UniProtKB/Swiss-Prot annotation:
Binding site residues for a divalent metal cation: D8, D9, S39, N91
The protein, known as: 5'-nucleotidase SurE
Gene Ontology terms: cellular component: cytoplasm
Gene this chain is encoded by: surE
Required cofactor names: a divalent metal cation
Family of the protein in this entry: Belongs to the SurE nucleotidase family.
Domain of life from the UniProt record: Bacteria
């Protein structure tokens, strides 16, 4: 099996390089990642200019674009052949709950599903035990032949930032959600132009049993199956009753 590895923290990030180190022991790998940190890029594509993949070492390329650009180029065959699976990560920090809306890590996996490849997004809930997350992925791939998922599903995996021996196990979860983000922070500009940093993520709000937040807080690896169908099916019936009363 040949695996494409991507991320949003950039090619030089410890997370992606740790993942590559582990996966190449058992699999053929191709690493294609942004040339700098592109956290929060979500599913954006670079459409305003051409993008350039640059070979850094054998099997590793950096791209002056977004995580989605990287996967799009790799799976379109313009970089070094085809792959069987895409693993995005290891992200530096959690992608829990509604983090997935903004996450370039999750977006890279989502692009892979758009292009017909199975995909995993993996994040470490911290910045220390990347080996733990890599070992989890190795174990999941070892047993992946027994997994059957519907088309269009990707797995969002969050790993507690603890030594591997301290993991409690694995839980299949749903996405929780956070309180609204903190307010933008004013920044000093040398020319006096109003400038702001985007506010930090807020604290978790829905951390009830069964959520990804709850699982990782108890020391479990969280695996949430997600897809791109954002339809709220429960709202269709009342919405239809309302629109049926409207004449155009």
């Amino acid at each position: 099996m040949r695996i494409l590895i991507a991320n949003d923290d950039g090619l030089d990030a410890l997370g992606i390089q740790t993942l590559a180190k582990y996966l190449q022991r058992e699999y053929a790998i191709l690493v294609v990642a942004p040339d700098r940190n592109r956290s929060g890029a979500s599913n954006s594509l670079t459409l305003s200019r051409p993008i350039q993949p640059v070979k850094v070492v054998e099997g590793q390329y950096r791209v002056d674009g977004t995580p989605t650009d990287c996967v799009n180029l790799a799976l379109s065959g313009v970089i070094d052949g085809d792959v069987d699976l895409v693993v995005s990560g290891i992200n530096h920090g959690a992608n829990l709950g509604d983090d997935v809306i903004y996450s370039g890590t999750v977006a890279a996996a989502m692009e892979a599903r758009h292009l017909g490849r199975p995909a995993l997004a993996v994040s470490l809930v911290g910045n220390l035990h990347f080996d733990t997350a890599a070992k989890v992925i190795m174990q999941l791939l070892k047993d992946s032949h027994t997994l059957e998922l519907p088309a269009g599903i990707l797995l969002n995996i969050n790993v507690p930032d603890v030594p591997y021996s301290e993991l409690k196990g694995i839980q299949v979860t749903r996405l929780g959600y956070r309180h609204k983000a903190q307010a933008p922070i004013s920044a000093q500009h040398p020319k006096g132009i109003p400038s702001f940093w985007i506010g930090a993520l807020s604290e978790p709000h829905d951390v009830s049993e069964g959520t990804d937040f709850c699982a990782v807080s108890k020391g479990y690896v969280s695996i949430t199956p997600i897809h791109t169908d954002m339809t709220c099916y429960e709202a269709r019936s009342p919405l239809t009753k309302w629109t049926d009363t409207i004449t155009l």
